[in-house]
Amino acid sequence: MITIKKGLDLPIAGTPSQVINDGKTIKKVALLGEEYVGMRPTMHVRVGDEVKKAQILFEDKKNPGVKFTAPAAGKVIEVNRGAKRVLQSVVIEVAGEEQVTFDKFEAAQLSGLDREVIKTQLVESGLWTALRTRPFSKVPAIESATKAIFVTAMDTNPLAAKPELIINEQQEAFIAGLDILSALTEGKVYVCKSGTSLPRSSQSNVEEHVFDGPHPAGLAGTHMHFLYPVNAENVAWSINYQDVIAFGKLFLTGELYTDRVISLAGPVVNNPRLVRTVMGASLDDLTDSELMPGEVRVISGSVLTGTHATGPHAYLGRYHQQVSVLREGREKELLGWAMPGKNKFSVTRSFLGHLFKGQLFNMTTSTNGSDRSMVPIGSYERVMPLDMEPTLLLRDLCAGDSDSAQALGALELDEEDLALCTFVCPGKYEYGQLLRECLDKIEKEG
C-alpha cells in the first residue's frame, strides 16, 4: 500500500448517496471537441445528417486515423465552433437504436488477440480516444506503444462515486477490459485502487496497487509518480475504470457501450445520488428539476477541475464521471475576512470553521477575493504529495519559464494534478491553464 499524507479532501456539502439510480431521459448528446488536446477535426458529418451509434463523426488530422464516433443514434442538429473555428461540440438529437456493430469474441480469446486486431477495433469504434498519454494528456498515436498502462479504479475527487459499486456490477466486462489492455502492451497494466476488493484479471502483467490518503491519492498522475515516473522518453497511458468496462463490452458483445454511471451532487442538488446516463449526455436534460431555485453553475466533472457546462458545452465530458452543481457566489461580504467565519472553510485555518471537525460547507463559485500576487506561505506544499518543489514549479509556470518547469517535473503533470494548488492559492492563479500553456510550448519546441 502507498499512503499519501499530503493533500486535501474538500469538505463540501451535497455528498451523493452511493446507490445507482436511473437518470432522466436524455434527448440530446454531444462530443466536445475542446476536450481533446491539440485535436484538429476533419468532419465526416454535417447538420441534418442521420447517424448511427458508433458511426464516425470526425477524425483528427493531427493524429491520423484516430476516429471520434457518435455516442447515440439520431440526427446531427448542431456543429458548434468558437474562435478561430475551433470545434466546440457536435450535437445529436437522440432517435432510434441503429448502431454500427463490430466483431465479438469469447472471454477466453481476449488475452490472446493480436495487438493490431485490438487496435483496429478500438479505433473503428471510437474507444481508442479513452486512452490518454502522459506527458501531454493526448490521445495516443495509433502506431505508438507504451510499457505502462494505468487503470484509475479509485476516485478521490470531491463528491465522486465509489468505483467499486460500478465495477462490481460489471465484473465480467471489467475483467475482459483488463485482458484487452494486457494484450495492448508489452509492459505492465497497473490497476490502482483503494483498499476495496475488485475483480482481478489472471494475466501476469496486470498488477494491483493500493493507494490510501486524501485527494489527489486517486489521480493517475499520483499513481504514475510512485510506480512509473514519466518523462519525454518514458511515456505512460491512462484510462478510467468505466472505459475499461466499455472496452470489455465492445469485445464481448460487438457493440459500443456508452452507458455512464455518474455522481450528480453538490450543495444545490435536491437529491444528490448516482445516476445512470449516457456518454455526452445533455446536462440540461440530466439536471431538469433536480436543482434548488436560484442562480447555479452546472459543472461537468469535479468542482476542482471540471468545466462550466453552458451553451455549446452543456454536455457530459468524455472523461468526466460526475456532475457537480454550485451556487453562483456573486454576493459581496463587507469585511468578510474579519468575521469569525463559523460556516467558512479555510486551509490556513483563518476561520472558526476549522474547529468543527466533520462539518460540510455550502461552498459557492466565489473565489473570496480578487487576483493578487502569488504568496508562498506553505499552502502548496501542504496539498502536493508528489516529490517536487511546488512553489518553485508554480513560480516558473507563472513566469512562462518552460525549461525550468520541465526540470522541476512539469512533464509528469496534467491540469488535474495542480487543481488543489489552484484551490489554496491566495493569488487566485489558474495553474492548470498555465501548465497547459507550458506543456504546449515544450511539445512545440521538441
From Swiss-Prot:
The keyword Translocase applies. GO terms for molecular function: oxidoreductase activity, acting on NAD(P)H, quinone or similar compound as acceptor. It is an enzyme of class 7 (translocase). It catalyses: a ubiquinone + n Na(+)(in) + NADH + H(+) = a ubiquinol + n Na(+)(out) + NAD(+). Keywords: Ion transport, NAD, Sodium, Sodium transport, Translocase, Transport, Ubiquinone. One of its GO terms (biological process) is sodium ion transport. It holds the Pfam family NQRA_2nd. Its EC number is 7.2.1.1. HAMAP family: NqrA. NQR complex catalyzes the reduction of ubiquinone-1 to ubiquinol by two successive reactions, coupled with the transport of Na(+) ions from the cytoplasm to the periplasm. NqrA to NqrE are probably involved in the second step, the conversion of ubisemiquinone to ubiquinol. Belongs to the NqrA family. Composed of six subunits; NqrA, NqrB, NqrC, NqrD, NqrE and NqrF. This is Na(+)-translocating NADH-quinone reductase subunit A.
